[in-house]
Amino acid sequence: MRLTIIIPTCNNEATIRQLLISIESKEHYRILCIDGGSTDQTIPMIERLPRELKHISLIQLQNASIATCINKGLMDIKMTDPHDSDAFMVINPTSIVLPGKLDRLTAAFKNNDNIDMVIGQRAYNYHGEWKLKSADEFIKDNRIVTLTEQPDLLSMMSFDGKLFSAKFAELQCDETLANTYNHTILVKAMQKATDIHLVSQMIVGDNDIDTHATSNDEDFNRYITEIMKIRQRVMEMLLLPEQRLLYSDMVDRILFNNSLKYYMNEHPAVTHTTIQLVKDYIMSMQHSDYVSQNMFDIINTVEFIGENWDREIYELWRQTLIQVGINRPTYKKFLIQLKGRKFAHRTKSMLKR
């Protein structure tokens, strides 16, 4: 078979060489490095590698997003001879292909003409050891499924560890989104796939140190707005309640609440803007399926981490919760109760130690 591997890059000098030399397969493959405008040593490093490794091509774009780079690679597959690519992968430039694992995906793809996707497990680097990502724990054995049979696939909104039939090169990433650009293309591919082969082995490891798109007010506002947009868009694409619950759980718990925790730990003072954003998100949840516990977890994040409450901001928060059927006391009672809850939480944490 013939495999095309798309790697979008932008200022990845710390990891790109390690990724490229980790790619090995018995199959015929080519690597398309699509750079979005690196200003570090990423491009020179890629240009030097063809002397050591075959199959590497570099396409340079200017001021291009990750989505644009990936779409350029997909366009290249569509424009070349159909016999040049039977399948493709997109690999994050901060990832690494674990030794001998790429051919686990290609072997599964070749095994059955109805296989349109092959999905392996992803790993993260924990003190030098590869650990299985919790979202991939449902892949317990090698088997063939569909999205209807295995809705847990919707918790894996990443290209890493996935191999696609070349026919899906007609799909596109959303270039209007900076962080969730791959959600719609992945959901469409899963929905269109005749069969999906699950491989219960860790294929790709992620070397990336946690990065957050919510370090300041402007970034946080933009990120939350994007999450609300993609959440609504994908929820409208999913027909089955179980699929919508699993996808919304991933977005509400991991993308939204984890980012909210990070932002509020950096900026604990409660502001009107923060409460309004959380209000908008909570109200948007009411128009679709969601896991109830996630709503309470979001509320706990705001109340436990938030500091410097004033009467006006609290009243906005209180009215928001009343609209979704959750009662809150008057301002003074809230402050007293919150102080008690925080003290009890700290005491419980100390006892656990």
Curated annotation (Swiss-Prot):
Its EC number is 2.4.-.-. The keyword Transferase applies. GO terms for molecular function: glycosyltransferase activity. Keywords: Cell shape, Cell wall biogenesis/degradation, Glycosyltransferase, Teichoic acid biosynthesis, Transferase. The keyword Transferase applies. GO terms for biological process: cell wall organization; regulation of cell shape; teichoic acid biosynthetic process. Belongs to the glycosyltransferase 2 family. This is Putative glycosyltransferase TagX. It comes from Staphylococcus aureus (strain MSSA476).
